[in-house]
Amino acid sequence: MIIPHPERHFFFRENPELLDELIALGAWTQISVDSLIGKNGAEAENFALQLLSRGSIHTLATDAHNTKRRPNLSLGYAIVEQRAGISAADAIRSRMLTIVP
């Protein structure tokens, strides 16, 4: 199971231990790059960065729902590398390839 955008959900921000329980059961999180750069508000950004520091980001999302919005996945990987190291970014890349080869 992939949990999309938990950083944008009040429920998970207020109850991060429940997200931890789902992850322990095998769920993955999908964090929006826009949240990592603050486009989804300070609360989403702070929680996304908290998840990153805890190693709880499994995949990244671009929110590119149409052809007019360009994906910024490379920016997301750059943030992950800067804050958590290249091995964390490589782990996310590898996981994403198992979903979309």
Feature locations, PLM:
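Residue-level detector of family-conserved "landmark" positions at structurally sensitive sites
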Residues: 4, 32, 61-62, 89-91
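A general structural signal for well-ordered secondary-structure junctions
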Residues: 28, 57-58, 86
